Swiss-Prot record:
Keywords on record: Cytoplasm, Methyltransferase, rRNA processing, S-adenosyl-L-methionine, Transferase
This protein's name: Ribosomal RNA small subunit methyltransferase H
Annotated stretches, region: Disordered: 274-351
Organism: Methylorubrum extorquens (strain PA1)
Lineage, broadest ranks: Bacteria, Pseudomonadati, Pseudomonadota, Alphaproteobacteria, Hyphomicrobiales
SUPFAM superfamilies given in the database record: Putative methyltransferase TM0872, insert domain, S-adenosyl-L-methionine-dependent methyltransferases
Family: Belongs to the methyltransferase superfamily. RsmH family.
Gene this chain is encoded by: rsmH
Organism superkingdom: Bacteria
Gene Ontology terms: cellular component: cytoplasm
GO molecular function: rRNA (cytosine-N4-)-methyltransferase activity
Reaction(s) this enzyme catalyzes, per UniProt: cytidine(1402) in 16S rRNA + S-adenosyl-L-methionine = N(4)-methylcytidine(1402) in 16S rRNA + S-adenosyl-L-homocysteine + H(+)
UniProt enzyme class: transferase
Amino acid sequence: MSRAPRTARAELPKGAQARHVPVLLAEVLAALSLDRPGLAVDGTFGAGGYTRALLEAGPEVRVIAIDRDPTAIRGGADLVTASGGRLRLVQGRFGDLDTLIADQDEPQADWVVLDIGVSSMQIDEAQRGFSFRQDGPLDMRMGGEGPSAADLVNGEEETTLADILYHFGEERRSRAVARAIVEARRRAPIETTAQLADLVAGVVRPEPGSPIHPATRSFQGLRIAVNDELGELVRGLHAAERVLKPGGRLAVVTFHSLEDRIVKQFFSARSGRAAQASRHVPGVERPAPKSFKLVTKGPVLPSEAETDVNPRSRSAKLRAGERTDAPAPPPLSAIETLASLPAPQGRGPRR
């Protein structure tokens, strides 16, 4: 994908927010094409990297930034002050972004950006319980509400744990890990990230020469389940579709194959490349109005230079689309299915 020229930048004081350079930033800005006054919605504020770039793209770009994490909202206070009234921070889930911006008297938006998954800020804070590289409480909740990872690990049935690890974490040894978890918790509750990481490492052997920690996939699966991340992504795509004006653009950055599959199927169906099935008429595929046209013809990947500087970007993919004037069709049942645990179907190829 060719990179669009940068628009005039409205510089913000460097002290307004700790600098955080998000993944594929130049490519996201090019895909959005912020070439006019309007409202941008950053559905995943985090450390504020995309929001800062949106504000700097032009002096007449206004931003509503959303995050379910109250810590992120508090951390953005200086950036709000520096924005001169152009930034509003809203605590909530991006799956409700249409309702959240309507509550701000903004029924429509010109641009929406979603950066899916856990933020670097959350990973780096041991007390949040996301990282297997730092010991902390086994939490993983982005917003602090609902059951924690410790609740799942110590309370779910073995078969459910195995399904979570396999389908959300893509862990091939999911049954063995789930069995080890159940055996360990009979002796004592599993309460810290180090306990769980060590337990998984005793079951999943690292591949020779691989930099991937043996607990990576298990932690991913639990985190996705705790935060309903795939369900939130599905709701966010449909919410963005409802709020975008004709000509408005949606850019989505994903970090693993499950997320990317959902985004790919959404844009494929909504652009007319695939038939659409609705939950309201299950099993029936039919032509539907094309609510998006593709901006990116395939996934945009980070450059080698970016992955050298930021190894966490290596799995990132960007997809983007431009809203047409067609009304938003009913939600897609196909991507709703991808976001859920499938019904049990025998033992399959996992161990």
